[in-house]
A protein has these predicted regions:
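Residue-level detector of short, conserved catalytic/binding motifs and their immediate flanks
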Residues: 10-12, 34, 76, 87-89, ...
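Short acidic, glycine-rich loop/turn motifs
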Residues: 16-18, 80-82, 204-205
Length: 208
């Protein structure tokens, strides 16, 4: 993440040439996309700046609350170009996959993204979204995203916002239990990044 880039221990995003199960579950968990999350943290909630217990605690809290999916992790020692870089969390990343976030062929996965403005990024904005934020597409893949599907997702999110801000019929669009669990997890953890970037929303079928 961007904050982590300024810390002594850098996080890394891994993009493999072919799918692999790096954590060692089974073939169903194979993926090209993985993350190496740093142990150190700049989060002021944590008293010990040497140990990022917030990340590990977050995964534990989400599993305890019964989230449909929480990234699987494993501690790993990282050596890069012959140099030892320290202890990391090897973690699954957020993506459409049967063993991650499975929205099916007709669903979508988007991110409330502070870096929507990056060159080549496909994005859209809604009326009530803060000016510094934009929604970017994670699934369908932006490279194959049709204009019709893009417009349908945009229209759907406008309807979601309208229902929320008019206090009428929001339950037709959002899963209250899922939203409540998400808020509770951030309250328990004292997260200072709630509703910032790295917030993902998904729908399993755009037609329903």
């Amino acid at each position: 993440n961007t904050t982590g880039a300024y810390l002594p221990q850098k996080p890394y995003k891994l993009k493999l040439s072919k799918k692999a199960d790096l954590i060692g579950f089974d073939a169903d968990f194979k993926s090209k996309d993985w993350a190496l999350l740093s142990i150190c943290t700049g989060n002021q909630v944590m008293k010990n700046q040497e140990c990022n217990l917030l990340t590990l605690g977050g995964f534990t809290v989400c599993r305890a609350l019964g989230f449909p999916w929480t990234p699987r992790t494993e501690f790993v020692n990282v050596v890069l170009n012959g140099q030892y870089r320290g202890l990391y969390y090897l973690a699954e990343t957020v993506e459409q996959a049967e063993k991650r976030i499975d929205v099916g062929a007709d669903g979508f996965l988007i991110e409330n993204d502070a870096y929507w403005w990056k060159e080549g990024e496909q994005y859209f904005k809604t009326e009530h979204l803060p000016y510094m934020m934009g929604y970017t597409f994670k699934y369908p893949d932006p490279d194959v995203l049709t204009e019709d599907t893009k417009n349908a997702i945009h229209e759907y999110m406008n309807s979601v916002e309208s229902a929320i801000f008019s206090h009428s019929g929001a339950n037709r669009y959002i899963d209250y239990e899922s939203f409540a669990k998400w808020l509770l997890a951030h309250d328990i953890l004292g997260s200072d990044d709630v509703a910032g970037s790295n917030m993902f929303l998904y729908k399993e079928s755009l037609g329903n």
